[in-house]
From Swiss-Prot:
Stretch list, region Coil 1B: 137-228
Mod. after translation: Proteolytically cleaved by caspases during epithelial cell apoptosis.
Residue ranges of the region described as Coil 2: 253-390
Pfam families given in the database record: Filament
Ranges for region Linker 1: 120-136
The protein's name in its UniProt record: Keratin, type I cytoskeletal 18
Modified residues (Phosphoserine): 12, 22, 36
Region (Linker 12): 229-252
GO molecular function: structural molecule activity
Stretches the record annotates as Head: 2-83
Length: 431
C-alpha cells in the first residue's frame, strides 16, 4: 500500500497591498505525512518539513482521513506575516493532534486484528449449532398450544353464551307475550267493570225515578184527599139515606196509602233484589272468566315451558347430530383411506401372484422340456441295454419306441410362497 502526501505552498511578496497564501494538502491513499511549515519575514524563505506515517484503516469501519486546508490573508506585509505565523502554528498543533490520534488508532487497530485472528483460530470452521434455540422453540410451541387451547375454550364459551342468550330471548318473548295477554285481559275486565258501573247507574237512575214517581203519587193523593175534605166541609147538604153506613173515607185513604206503600216497598225490594242478583251474576261471570283466564294462562305457561324444553332439546339434538355427522365423516374418511391402502396391497399381491404364475408356468415348461429329454434318454438307454444284452430286438420296435413320449404335468398351488397342494398329470404322445 503506497503512502503519499503532497503539500504545495505559494507565497508572493510585492508592493501589491493584497497578498494571498494558500496551503493545500491532498491525500490520495491512506498514507499520512506530518508536516510543519515555517515562514520567513514577509513570506520569503518559506519551507516545509514533513514526516510520513502509516494510515489507519481497519475492518471496523475507521475511515481514511483526507483534508484540504486553505489559508488566505489580505492586508499589508506585516499583517500577512503575523497571520501566516499564527496559521502555521495552528496547523502544526492540529497536525500534532492528528498524529496522536493516528497513533492511538493504529494501536487499537493492531489489537483488534490480533483479537480477530485469535478468535478465528479458536473458533475453527463454521458449524451451525441450533441446539441453543431448541428451548426457545419448545417454549414457543407450548405458547402456541396454550393459545390454541384458550382459543378453543373461548369459542366454546362464546357458543354457550350464545345458547344462553337465545334461551333468555325465548324466555323474554314468552314473558312479553304473557304480559300482553294479561294487559289484554285487564283491558277486557275494565270494559266489563265499566259496563257493570253503567248498568248500576242506570238502575240507580230508575230507582230515583220510581221514588220521585212515588212521591208525586203520594202528593197527588194527599191533594185529592184534601180537596174531597174541603168539598165535604163546604157543602151544607145532609142527605140521609136509608142504606147501610158507608166506609169511613179516611180509613179508605189509609188503606190506599198502605197499599201503595206496600207496593212501593215491594217494588223497591224487587228492584234491590234484581240489582243484587245482577251484580252477583256479573261477579260470578267475572270470577268464572278470571278462573278460566288463570287456567288458560297456566296452560299457556306450561305449553311455553314445554316448547322451551323441546327447543333446548332440539338444539342439543342438532348439536349431537352435527357431532355424529362429523364423526361419521371422519370414520368414512378413515375407512376410505384404509380401503385404498388395502386395494393397493391387493394390487401388489395380485401383481406378485401374476408374476409367480408366470414363473411357475415358465418353470413348468422347463420341467416338461427336461422331462421329455429325460424320457428320451431313458428310452435310448433302454434300447442300448437291449442291444448290449443281445435279446430279441427289431429295428421297427426301436423306431416305434423312440416315437412315443410321455408328458408329465405338475400343478402346484402356492399361498404366501408355500406349496399348499400339488397334482401330477402324465400324458403319452408320439413324436
Amino acid at each position: 500500500m503506497s503512502l503519499r502526501t503532497s503539500y504545495s505552498v505559494r507565497s508572493s511578496t510585492s508592493q501589491v497591498p493584497v497578498s494571498q497564501v494558500s496551503i493545500k494538502r491532498t491525500t490520495n491513499v491512506p498514507t499520512y505525512r506530518a508536516a510543519s511549515i515555517y515562514g520567513g519575514a514577509g513570506g520569503q524563505g518559506t519551507r516545509i518539513s514533513s514526516a510520513s506515517y502509516s494510515g489507519v484503516r481497519s475492518g471496523l469501519g475507521v475511515p481514511s482521513m483526507s483534508s484540504s486546508i486553505q489559508v488566505s490573508a489580505s492586508g499589508s506585509t506585516g499583517e500577512i506575516m503575523g497571520n501566516e505565523k499564527m496559521a502555521m502554528q495552528n496547523l502544526n498543533d492540529r497536525l500534532a493532534s492528528y498524529l496522536e490520534k493516528v497513533r492511538i488508532l493504529e494501536q487499537a487497530n493492531s489489537k483488534l486484528e490480533l483479537k480477530i485472528r485469535e478468535a478465528l483460530e479458536k473458533r475453527g470452521p463454521d458449524v451451525h449449532d441450533y441446539s441453543r434455540f431448541q428451548p426457545i422453540v419448545d417454549e414457543l410451541r407450548k405458547k402456541i398450544f396454550d393459545a390454541t387451547t384458550n382459543n378453543a375454550r373461548l369459542v366454546l364459551q362464546i357458543d354457550n353464551a350464545r345458547l344462553a342468550a337465545d334461551d333468555f330471548r325465548v324466555k323474554y318473548e314468552s314473558e312479553l307475550s304473557i304480559r300482553q295477554g294479561v294487559e289484554a285481559d285487564i283491558t277486557g275486565l275494565r270494559k266489563v267493570i265499566d259496563d257493570t258501573n253503567l248498568n248500576r247507574m242506570n238502575l240507580e237512575s230508575e230507582i230515583e225515578a220510581l221514588k220521585e214517581e212515588l212521591i208525586f203519587l203520594k202528593k197527588n193523593h194527599d191533594n185529592e184527599v184534601m180537596e174531597l175534605r174541603n168539598q165535604i166541609s163546604q157543602s151544607g147538604v145532609q142527605v140521609d139515606v136509608d142504606a147501610p153506613k158507608g166506609q169511613d173515607l179516611s180509613q179508605i185513604m189509609e188503606e190506599i196509602r198502605a197499599k201503595y206503600e206496600k207496593m212501593a216497598l215491594k217494588n223497591q225490594e224487587e228492584l234491590k233484589a234484581w240489582h243484587e242478583s245482577q251484580i252477583t251474576e256479573v261477579q260470578v261471570q267475572v270470577t268464572q272468566n278470571t278462573e278460566a283466564l288463570q287456567g288458560a294462562r297456566s296452560e299457556v305457561n306450561e305449553l311455553r315451558r314445554q316448547i322451551q324444553t323441546l327447543e333446548i332439546e332440539l338444539e342439543s339434538q342438532k348439536n349431537l347430530k352435527g357431532s355424529l355427522e362429523g364423526t361419521l365423516r371422519d370414520t368414512e374418511m378413515r375407512y376410505n383411506m384404509e380401503i385404498e391402502n388395502l386395494n393397493t396391497i391387493i394390487l401388489q399381491l395380485e401383481a406378485e401372484l401374476t408374476q409367480l404364475r408366470g414363473n411357475i408356468q415358465h418353470q413348468t415348461q422347463e420341467y416338461e422340456a427336461l422331462l421329455n429329454i429325460k424320457m428320451k434318454l431313458e428310452a435310448e438307454i433302454a434300447t442300448y441295454r437291449r442291444l448290449l444284452d443281445g435279446g430279441d430286438f427289431k429295428l421297427q420296435d426301436a423306431l416305434e419306441e423312440q416315437k412315443k413320449v410321455k408328458v408329465m404335468t405338475v400343478t402346484q398351488t402356492l399361498v404366501d410362497g408355500k406349496v399348499v397342494s400339488s397334482s401330477t398329470e402324465t400324458k403319452e404322445r408320439k413324436l
